């Protein structure tokens, strides 16, 4: 039985934290980096591995930027199935994909344009024979503090990881986990959280520093240096 690898990129958000006061309301994923929209870099990073048969980009209805941003890219489609939050968008994109239960789904953030080919290959290689699937992640290196305006405590960083994307799971398992999370009203911020809540333990695969999420205005300058 042939199992396809399909990538999903949720790109229906606006990325308000990445904008400076007074900047035009261009969604973060379409802002330029190294002369191209950030979303295009993220999709091209996925296309670098020929095992991924298709990249499916989930956008908001009426999105006026995606066609130009992704023009000419092979194995790439975009669909207006963006929802009010990430879990809804990914669930809709997964349903729209028509993936079989045993197909592999890789969900990748549009705001991670610096994904190295080696890290992507490492994730795929590690997960293809895994019963659950997994995600790219980095061990926490800094001292971690908890608190608001003042420190309330120092958190033991031993065993703590910073989750990255892609996150790779079989379509059937991911579909079930997302449905459970939505039904329970869980505030999951990534697919691994939904899979964990469904009783599974995703595999941790070494990520990469340059695969950070572009979140704040200064992040654009830093990512430019990588690209």
From Swiss-Prot:
Pfam families: IspD. GO terms for molecular function: 2-C-methyl-D-erythritol 4-phosphate cytidylyltransferase activity. InterPro entries: IspD, IspD/TarI, IspD/TarI_cytidylyltransf_bact, ISPD_synthase_CS, Nucleotide-diphossugar_trans. The record marks 17, 28 as: Transition state stabilizer. Keywords: Isoprene biosynthesis, Nucleotidyltransferase, Transferase. Pathway: Isoprenoid biosynthesis; isopentenyl diphosphate biosynthesis via DXP pathway; isopentenyl diphosphate from 1-deoxy-D-xylulose 5-phosphate: step 2/6. SUPFAM superfamilies: Nucleotide-diphospho-sugar transferases. Its EC number is 2.7.7.60. PROSITE patterns: ISPD. The record marks 157, 213 as: Positions MEP for the nucleophilic attack. One of its GO terms (biological process) is isopentenyl diphosphate biosynthetic process, methylerythritol 4-phosphate pathway. It catalyses: 2-C-methyl-D-erythritol 4-phosphate + CTP + H(+) = 4-CDP-2-C-methyl-D-erythritol + diphosphate. Belongs to the IspD/TarI cytidylyltransferase family. IspD subfamily. Catalyzes the formation of 4-diphosphocytidyl-2-C-methyl-D-erythritol from CTP and 2-C-methyl-D-erythritol 4-phosphate (MEP). This is 2-C-methyl-D-erythritol 4-phosphate cytidylyltransferase. It comes from Bordetella parapertussis (strain 12822 / ATCC BAA-587 / NCTC 13253). The gene is ispD.
């Amino acid at each position: 039985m042939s199992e396809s690898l399909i990538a999903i990129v949720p790109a229906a958000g606006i990325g308000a934290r990445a904008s400076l006061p007074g900047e035009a309301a261009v969604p973060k994923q379409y802002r330029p980096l190294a002369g191209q929209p950030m979303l295009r870099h993220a999709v091209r990073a996925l296309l670098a591995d020929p095992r991924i048969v298709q990249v499916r980009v989930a956008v908001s209805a009426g999105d006026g930027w995606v066609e130009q941003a992704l023009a000419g890219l092979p194995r790439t489609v975009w669909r207006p199935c963006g929802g009010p939050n990430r879990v809804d968008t990914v669930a809709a994109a997964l349903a729209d994909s028509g993936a079989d239960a045993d197909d592999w789904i890789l969900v990748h953030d549009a705001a991670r344009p610096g994904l190295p080919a080696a890290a992507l290959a490492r994730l795929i290689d590690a997960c293809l024979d895994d019963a659950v699937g997994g995600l790219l992640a980095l061990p926490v290196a800094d001292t971690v503090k908890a608190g608001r305006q003042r420190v309330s405590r120092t958190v033991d960083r031993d065993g703590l990881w910073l989750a990255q994307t892609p996150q790779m799971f079989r379509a059937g398992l991911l579909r079930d986990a997302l449905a459970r999370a939505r039904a329970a009203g869980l505030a999951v911020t990534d697919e691994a959280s939904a899979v964990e809540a469904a009783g599974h333990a995703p595999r941790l695969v070494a990520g990469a520093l340059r695969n950070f999420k572009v979140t704040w205005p200064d992040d654009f300058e830093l990512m430019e240096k990588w690209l």
